[in-house]
Amino acid sequence: MFKKLFGLGSKTNEETIVAPLTGAVKNIEEVPDPVFAGRMMGDGVAIDPTEGVVVSPVDGEIVQLFHTKHAIGIKAKNGTEILIHVGLETVKMEGEGFEAHVSEGQAVKAGDKLISFDLELIREKAKSTITPIVITNTDAAESIKTTVGVAATKGSTEVMKVTMK
């Protein structure tokens, strides 16, 4: 009762996800990959980046950094687990053109630089530069609200609001 009366509790369950990249925000269904478009990895959005920098979309912890540096997992303070997968079929690049600025277990704040990448090299060597940002523990979420069709600025534009159960 007190939680509802004083607005306690609800704030800890809700997480605002800001854009980890600068670019056009798209519906996850627009990703030209059936695994992401079919939400098999989780619900979310995708960004078609205009620059090669990924920043943290939340305050949280780096829980996974792929050795090829093309993807990173972050756990927000409310338990939301976020996967940022730079481009499609970029794993085949074996880390070429990617640089990590964080390591697993590291605490991060929204806007902290996580990965930098060579956008032109990805255009040349991978299927697409489109970058899915998905909530991998979608089943633990009460609601996921997405904002698509906007031009996002990394570290500031809200792209999702996730409320955990």
UniProtKB/Swiss-Prot annotation:
<dbReference type="GO" id="GO:0005737">
    <property type="term" value="C:cytoplasm"/>
</dbReference>
<keyword id="KW-0598">Phosphotransferase system</keyword>
<dbReference type="Pfam" id="PF00358">
    <property type="entry name" value="PTS_EIIA_1"/>
</dbReference>
<keyword id="KW-0963">Cytoplasm</keyword>
<feature type="binding site">
    <location>
        <position position="85"/>
    </location>
    <ligand>
        <name>Zn(2+)</name>
    </ligand>
</feature>
<keyword id="KW-0597">Phosphoprotein</keyword>
<feature type="modified residue" description="Phosphohistidine; by HPr">
    <location>
        <position position="85"/>
    </location>
</feature>
<dbReference type="InterPro" id="IPR011055">
    <property type="entry name" value="Dup_hybrid_motif"/>
</dbReference>
<feature type="site" description="Important for phospho-donor activity">
    <location>
        <position position="70"/>
    </location>
</feature>
<keyword id="KW-0808">Transferase</keyword>
<feature type="active site" description="Tele-phosphohistidine intermediate; for EIIA activity">
    <location>
        <position position="85"/>
    </location>
</feature>
<keyword id="KW-0762">Sugar transport</keyword>
<dbReference type="InterPro" id="IPR001127">
    <property type="entry name" value="PTS_EIIA_1_perm"/>
</dbReference>
<keyword id="KW-0862">Zinc</keyword>
<dbReference type="GO" id="GO:0009401">
    <property type="term" value="P:phosphoenolpyruvate-dependent sugar phosphotransferase system"/>
</dbReference>
<comment type="subunit">
    <text>Heterodimer with glycerol kinase (glpk).</text>
</comment>
<feature type="domain" description="PTS EIIA type-1">
    <location>
        <begin position="33"/>
        <end position="137"/>
    </location>
</feature>
<keyword id="KW-0479">Metal-binding</keyword>
<comment type="function">
    <text>The phosphoenolpyruvate-dependent sugar phosphotransferase system (sugar PTS), a major carbohydrate active transport system, catalyzes the phosphorylation of incoming sugar substrates concomitantly with their translocation across the cell membrane. The enzyme II complex composed of PtsG and Crr is involved in glucose transport.</text>
</comment>
<dbReference type="GO" id="GO:0016301">
    <property type="term" value="F:kinase activity"/>
</dbReference>
<keyword id="KW-0418">Kinase</keyword>
<dbReference type="InterPro" id="IPR050890">
    <property type="entry name" value="PTS_EIIA_component"/>
</dbReference>
<keyword id="KW-0813">Transport</keyword>
<protein>
    <recommendedName>
        <fullName>PTS system glucose-specific EIIA component</fullName>
    </recommendedName>
</protein>
<feature type="binding site">
    <location>
        <position position="70"/>
    </location>
    <ligand>
        <name>Zn(2+)</name>
    </ligand>
</feature>
<dbReference type="GO" id="GO:0046872">
    <property type="term" value="F:metal ion binding"/>
</dbReference>
